[in-house]
Amino acid sequence: MRVLISNDDGVFAEGIRTLAAAAVARGHDVTVVCPDQERSATGHGLTLQTPIRAERADELFVPGVTAWACSGTPADCMKLALFELVKDKPDLVLSGINHGPNLGTDVFCSGTVAAAMEGTLEGIPSMAISSACFQWRQFQAGAELAVEVAEQALADQWPENLLLNLNIPPCNRDAMGPLRWTRLSIRRYDEQFSSRVDPRGRAYYWLAGEVVNDLESAGEGPRDWPSDVAQIHANSPSLTPIQPDLFWRGSLSGLPQLKLKDQLVR
């Protein structure tokens, strides 16, 4: 199987190298196209004002991996891979393993999820994989689980337009609880910015919010599914189905009436 892998932590990150090695160990044909440096929290941004460069980086990975380090964002990397660098269309896109969680509504700013979403938009089964702790640096168990889940999802006829978002708790495989389907949590933060003053007396800001640990809040989905945050809190891997269609799924009668002299027709 042809597997294309990217991330947002960059080509030197241990997570992506472990994931690529796990896919090779399962007998897959692996290509990596990922940022040449840290590109975390870049969301689905694209590079439009400067050229994008790509250099071979095979030596950073296990034998059998074809690798490119790209100057762009994770979404750039995936587009460049699919339309320029990779000869044959991949059977599977994997993005990760991210060095930190991608839970709940944080997926909207995640470069890891954006790379997987690019694959989804191009009709390729795609999965984002994240280690749900910034300090945890043992990726082997998560990499093996991710490849196993992806292989089984493909065998089960992976639906079109489905992106799988896998978060893995910070523990060894034998200490993990069971994998479960989960809903996206609603993520909120306290004290979003840290304000400081430079030597010339001008204010500047660091984005430095602390996440509110809410195990209950979650969006749409079956009520008997836990939130992804609650699942990770239980030391169990979470698997959340995501789709690119953001159309409002609430009641249409609840939409604003917008009485603008018949300018809005419904």
UniProtKB/Swiss-Prot annotation:
Its EC number is 3.1.3.5. InterPro entries: SurE, SurE-like_Pase/nucleotidase, SurE-like_sf. The keyword Hydrolase applies. Binds 1 divalent metal cation per subunit. SUPFAM superfamilies: SurE-like. It is an enzyme of class 3 (hydrolase). GO terms for cellular component: cytoplasm. It catalyses: a ribonucleoside 5'-phosphate + H2O = a ribonucleoside + phosphate. Keywords: Cytoplasm, Hydrolase, Metal-binding, Nucleotide-binding. A divalent metal cation binds at residues 8-9, 40, 98. Transmembrane segments: none annotated. Its cofactor is a divalent metal cation. One of its GO terms (molecular function) is 5'-nucleotidase activity. HAMAP family: SurE. Nucleotidase that shows phosphatase activity on nucleoside 5'-monophosphates. Belongs to the SurE nucleotidase family. This is 5'-nucleotidase SurE.
